[in-house]
Amino acid sequence: SLDDAEGDINISLNENKIKVAFGNFKIISKVIDGTFPDYTKVVPKNNDKNFSTKTNDLKNAIDRVSAVAINEEMKSKAIKLILNQNKLLLSVESQTKGFADEELDVNYNQDDVEIGFNSKYLIDICNEVDGEDINVSILDSISPAIIMDKSDENSFFVLMPMRI
C-alpha cells in the first residue's frame, strides 16, 4: 500500500506525460496544456438576499422533506424553498406520495423569495461544508445561488435553481 512505500520519489516529465514513481507504484498522467476557464464569469455578483442557518439543521430538514420523493420515477428531486421574515419553508410535492414541508428558523429579513433546487445537490453541498453555519445568497427564483461555509469564505458553491 502507499502507506508502506519507502524511498525516493522519481518524477519524470515530457511534452505529453508526467510520471511519478515511488516504491512499486507508478502513476502516469497526460499533461494537458490549455487555459483554465474563467470561473468568475459564472459566479453571481449581485445576489442581495442572504440567509444563514446551521448546516446540519438545513441538511437534515432537506433530507426529511425530500424523503417523500424517494423511489419515484423522477429525473431530479426538486425541493422548494420559500424565504420570509426569519423563516425558511422547505417543501416537496410528490404526485403519488403526497406533500411534505418543514420550517426552519433562519437569519433573514429581506423581501420574500421562492426558489427551487435539486435536493440531492443541496445535501451534497451541506456535506462538503465543514463549518457549523452556512450562508445562502439568492437574487431571484431563476438566478444561481451562492452557498458558503461561514467559517471559510474562500470556499463557496454556485448552484443553479430549478423551475418547480
Feature names for model-found ranges:
Residues S1-I32, N47-I164:
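DNA polymerase processivity clamps
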Residues D33-K41:
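Active-site loop ensemble at the mouth of alpha/beta enzyme cores that anchors a bound cofactor
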